[in-house]
């Protein structure tokens, strides 16, 4: 069949159902974008390519459908770097299209030229550069299938002089492979370990959500009467209202989950690479059960046993493993101490729920007083925990939430729960600031009938604030965004209070800036909430307005209390050896 290279490219996109693209328009790919309207492909032109990549991440994580990111070669493509690495650690399949400088000029250090294959080599599961125009459909088809198979970004690099060529090809048929099935002997061994367990605990990770295996883990947990914890930032991997749900592990997570995990004699880790933040101590509890038998299930064999010793590893689909274990459990599996275990789970959860409901303020470490001073400086102001309680009072159960990284968002780890998967979008282990706003925009584009709420601290929000200039247009859906406003980079300031004697370098934000005012200047609704009552009411109204097509940014004014530091394990108090003298500073030579 005769066609142009750009027609072949778009036809492959259509065959794979990729109908949504994010980026900023550029001359290097206009032959492709010219065909988007006729092909039924929506192009969302963001304010910054990095945010566009995070929109694509949010789009796919909320819906399970792959999106494409595309930008001008050189500086447009380099702006994708943070977003692509974020998607890689979020296990998000993503088509990364990188137009390249023309073959006839590349290597001359020309306009908008950079080594784009080298740039993404450690950030994608697969990458190919098109060498022959006649192979464009074959290469694109393979890149898309690789992204889906590995659940990760994959890159196609397109020299711009490959377009507007007439080729005669057959479109590739391709082959879809099933997800890896578990080894029968490994399932037998896992079932035997769990059948004899006195206190089994299940830890669900992102792989459970990606495999749509939550119902399978519910059935397995109920058979074993096993409490279920979720990994850090994967709070939607088990129904929040289920009696066996213990909550999230990790930083500012559920104390109940940590206490129950510490008692386990067998731990089944489903769909998780056991990222370090899911096993670090919290609330003073070193909860990972070092004497327990640990069964780790991950679709990627390279991640099994990578961060923690395991007794048994199974490289397979989490749902297939859960179903296989359930079918092989012994007749008395879960019966040992079942009633006592159920009572202990309920009591532990109840005790933590009461404690969490009464936690208004953050504690100071011995010898420090920042939080005490922060409360005294702004009496009557909401604390971060008060703000989170006010927020959860207004959240509908079906809402999709996004969270940025930072101290105030992390404090919220213990608060919202979810009835289904693909409802909680956090920045993941790459940890980029500026994720909350673009991710929730992408989620709303993917799920226009579902209410969405994004969260960010005011430092992180400043990185993506320019997207307010993009989202007010008629073809963009309405969203709701909550910004915690305490005028500081909280995580870094917390480190300064604990290890650097309140020497605040680069932690203070501009008191003159109003994010609500910026939203209004962009034609959106911007409101300020100063109390818990105002915040709950503002969020309820914003969600109603969202349903009516209006975007609202809520600037929630809070005091400057600071929660737990992210990295107690990585920080130490500095020592003075040679000392630093300002008199040693010399002028630079001219």
Curated annotation (Swiss-Prot):
Keywords: Acyltransferase, Cytoplasm, Magnesium, Metal-binding, Thiamine pyrophosphate, Transferase. Pathway: Organosulfur degradation; taurine degradation via aerobic pathway; acetyl phosphate and sulfite from taurine: step 2/2. It is an enzyme of class 2 (transferase). InterPro entries: DHS-like_NAD/FAD-binding_dom, Sulphoacetald_Actrfrase, THDP-binding, Thiamin_PyroP_enz_cen_dom, Thiamin_PyroP_enz_TPP-bd_dom, TPP-bd_CS, TPP_enz, TPP_enzyme_TPP-bd. Its main location: cytoplasm. One of its GO terms (molecular function) is acetolactate synthase activity. This is Sulfoacetaldehyde acetyltransferase. It comes from Rhodobacter capsulatus (strain ATCC BAA-309 / NBRC 16581 / SB1003).
